[in-house]
Amino acid sequence: MCIRDSGLTGTIGDYGRFCQMLLQKGELDGTRILGRKTVDFMALNHLPDNKDMAAMGQPVWSESSAEGIGYGLGMAVVIDAATTQLLRSTGEYFWGGAASTAFWIDPDEDMFVVFMTQLMPSSFYPIRNELRVAAYQTLID
């Protein structure tokens, strides 16, 4: 199956380091890679009039709706956590891959998640939503 924008390769460790760098506002292992304001700008909703993606049309490849989800620079951004009807934080940013892979970064909880699998299509089973619920249920104060 040939899917546009798929086929990127890397390691889960590298993906984790990338997420850690974004969580730390552009810094990793004491080295500044991106400016703090650049990361903040990437994670803002850039859709017109601060609309969510549902207002722009429903996603085809996702098992969850787009209500409360905006779009930043290269990633989806939670603009209203309650509207998403999932456990998440406003300001969280994330993206999923064609084979149900996913990452999310939640600055409020100081956490990131990288999930690798090969379940096609990603809309077949809500595995990412189940992972999200499980991850957030483990958080304690």
Model segments located where?
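Catalytic loop of the DD-peptidase/beta-lactamase superfamily, centered on the K-T-G motif
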Residues: 4-141
